[in-house]
């Protein structure tokens, strides 16, 4: 069996889709469907069972036996960088992850988890080491703290423990994220309403590493298949502008022009203006596949979003 936490979310559901493509159906999905809209991400996927997150955590703490587990992909967390309830975030993103990590270590189950480029804050080197990290929000801090915990444990681990610092992930199965969904998703919705795509003023200067979710799923499965341990960046290695994202959306629709709107005051001091994954460590570990550019990834995503049902 393979367990995917956050399996109804963006990255988790795409990992399940990739596992299905490999012929794996023996998948236990763990998630919190309080937001019932997320179920649509699972409708076309083949899984063995579903477990509520709270029930799963209780079982993990109790040390319950789930049978033979080939791997756990831990993608379940509060992913809202705008969430400021520190107690909630630390319970969801830190304490929960520690419990699951120790469950896996004790049973030598390969453990692959979601870290985040938010751990870097406004640093500009994006190298997977403590001195290059400085989160700007409590979400980033919760991820940073778990990375630090893993770094202490890795030398003694006898089974794979691998974290990926996800950069700006976009692609199919993110509609449930609302305001936290990708720029490409929101711009497409604006176009469907007959509006022009809107970007914050100055967006042509904001450069981000936008990584297609299908590529993220591939990296996770590669790490599992090769028994990889460590903490790695997961991005394209390219910094591209929000304007390039908008251009890709416009190219798909074949009409419209970019409009600018004022930049929100409350985001100014907490906004990463530049991200670009340093892939040196990932490449050294043996991952050689290419990552889609914004032009390639957004074009594929637009086809998926606008497919005929």
Swiss-Prot record:
Please name the catalytic residues of this protein: 139 (proton acceptor), 177 (proton acceptor)
* Keyword terms, alphabetized: Carbohydrate metabolism, Isomerase, NADP
Fill in the domain comment.
Answer: Contains a large N-terminal NADP-binding domain, and a smaller C-terminal substrate-binding domain.
Q: Cross-referenced Pfam families, in alphabetical order?
A: Epimerase (PF01370)
* Residues binding NADP(+): 10-11, 31-32, 38, 53, 75-79, 92, 143, 169, 177
What residues does substrate bind to? 168, 179, 186, 200-203, 208, 271
Gene Ontology molecular-function annotations: ADP-glyceromanno-heptose 6-epimerase activity; NADP binding
Name any cofactors this protein relies on.
NADP(+)
- Quote the catalytic activity from the record: ADP-D-glycero-beta-D-manno-heptose = ADP-L-glycero-beta-D-manno-heptose
Q: Which family does it belong to?
A: Belongs to the NAD(P)-dependent epimerase/dehydratase family. HldD subfamily.
Which BP terms from GO are recorded? ADP-L-glycero-beta-D-manno-heptose biosynthetic process; carbohydrate metabolic process
NCBIfam families linked: heptose_epim, PRK11150.1
Q: What is this protein called?
A: ADP-L-glycero-D-manno-heptose-6-epimerase
Kindly indicate whether the keyword Nucleus belongs to this entry. no
> What pathway is this protein said to act in by its record?
Nucleotide-sugar biosynthesis; ADP-L-glycero-beta-D-manno-heptose biosynthesis; ADP-L-glycero-beta-D-manno-heptose from D-glycero-beta-D-manno-heptose 7-phosphate: step 4/4
Complex and partners: Homopentamer.
- The record's gene field reads hldD
UniProt source species: Histophilus somni (strain 2336)
Q: What does this protein do?
A: Catalyzes the interconversion between ADP-D-glycero-beta-D-manno-heptose and ADP-L-glycero-beta-D-manno-heptose via an epimerization at carbon 6 of the heptose.
InterPro entries found in the cross-reference section: Epimerase_deHydtase (IPR001509), Heptose_epim (IPR011912), NAD(P)-bd_dom_sf (IPR036291)
SUPFAM superfamilies per the UniProt record, alphabetical? NAD(P)-binding Rossmann-fold domains
EC numbers listed for it are 5.1.3.20
Taxonomically, which superkingdom?
Answer: Bacteria
């Amino acid at each position: 069996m393979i367990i995917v936490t956050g399996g109804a979310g963006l990255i988790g559901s795409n990992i399940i889709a990739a596992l299905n493509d490999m012929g794996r159906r023996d998948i236990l999905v763990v998630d919190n469907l309080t937001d019932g809209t997320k179920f649509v991400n699972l409708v076309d996927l083949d899984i063995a069972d579903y477990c509520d997150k709270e029930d799963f955590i209780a079982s993990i703490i109790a040390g319950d036996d789930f049978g033979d587990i080939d791997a756990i992909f831990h993608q379940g967390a509060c992913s809202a960088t705008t969430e400021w309830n520190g107690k909630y975030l630390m319970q969801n993103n830190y304490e929960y992850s520690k419990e699951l990590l120790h469950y896996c270590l004790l049973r030598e189950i390969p453990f692959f988890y979601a870290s985040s480029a938010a751990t870097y804050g406004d640093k500009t080197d994006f190298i997977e080491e403590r001195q290059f990290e400085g989160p700007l929000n409590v979400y980033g801090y919760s991820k940073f703290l778990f990375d630090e915990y893993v770094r202490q444990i890795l030398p003694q681990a006898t089974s794979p423990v691998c974290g990926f610092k996800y950069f700006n992930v976009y692609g199919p199965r993110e509609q449930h994220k609302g305001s936290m969904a990708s720029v490409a998703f929101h711009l497409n919705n604006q176009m469907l309403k007959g509006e022009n795509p809107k970007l914050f003023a100055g967006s042509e200067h904001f450069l981000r590493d936008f990584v297609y979710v299908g590529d993220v799923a591939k990296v996770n499965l590669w790490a599992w298949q090769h028994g990889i341990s460590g903490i790695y960046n997961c991005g394209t290695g390219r910094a591209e502008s929000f304007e390039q994202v908008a251009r890709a959306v416009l190219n798909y629709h074949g009409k419209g022009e970019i409009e600018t709107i004022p930049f929100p005051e409350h985001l100014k001091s907490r906004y990463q203006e530049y991200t670009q994954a340093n892939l040196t460590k990932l490449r050294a570990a043996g991952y050689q596949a290419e990552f889609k550019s914004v032009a390639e990834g957004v074009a594929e995503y637009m086809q998926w979003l606008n497919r005929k049902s």
